Amino acid sequence: GQGAGIDLTNPGVTDIECYLNSFTYFPSDHRVLLSGKFSEYGWDKLPVNNITIATNEVASYYKTVALPSKKNNTSINCKIPVFNGGTLEAPVRTFITSNEKVVAVGNITNYCRINTEKSYAESMVLDYSKVASVLRMSRTGELDDSYRRDAEGVIGQILDACMVESDGIVIVGTFSSFDGQSVKNIVKLNAEGTLDETFMRNIGTGANGSITKIRYNKNKKKILITGEFSEFNGIPAQSVVMLNDDGTRDEIFKIGKMEGGLANFACLLDNDN
């Protein structure tokens, strides 16, 4: 098939420099939001910047624009993505909000998009805008300048994230500061991109080591985190903690003693068995 992470001139060889790490459907039309580390998508090598929207059959979703040729200044019809937006660095996760906007989370410093007014058929020109770790875009890729305006972002490294109720986003990793506030490897942003003070108060001192994975069960409204920590909010925790979506600890969840290593992934099933 087609996709990112494949050398289209040598389909049998996987290009490990490219990858996908998020795959999400838009509820209204089932088009697919894809993100990771890639600069082209599909057999037609559609130029993208780590994020794209594909058809519900995961084919390229593009529009045709006439661009001048550097060779003779004639116009050539070129394909560009309908989602004309993206990031300089690969997002860790991307999400679709309840009103079908796109939120990208990661160790991101710049938003970018193709400038069709300055581009040529042979080479696309990108415009860049500074962002701070988390950004929001429209379905066609325009940057939402009102979202997280003048935010500082993360000091450290974001490793994972999940979307919870009301378009909130919980971000985890190895970091000591987020938007100028001292934190311990976990934060929650509300729908407008500011820190959720209730959640931050409830998690207290957070984790005393890296949080590497996070998963959310929307039916049970529970968050599971795993990582290289032995305490969470000052209470012993053997690399796994379950939280309620307000940041309070689920006191019923007790993991058995582990020896010889740490958990690196956990998720909560919908059944109660």
Named regions from a protein language model:
Residues 1-273:
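Extracytoplasmic mature domains of secreted or surface-exposed proteins
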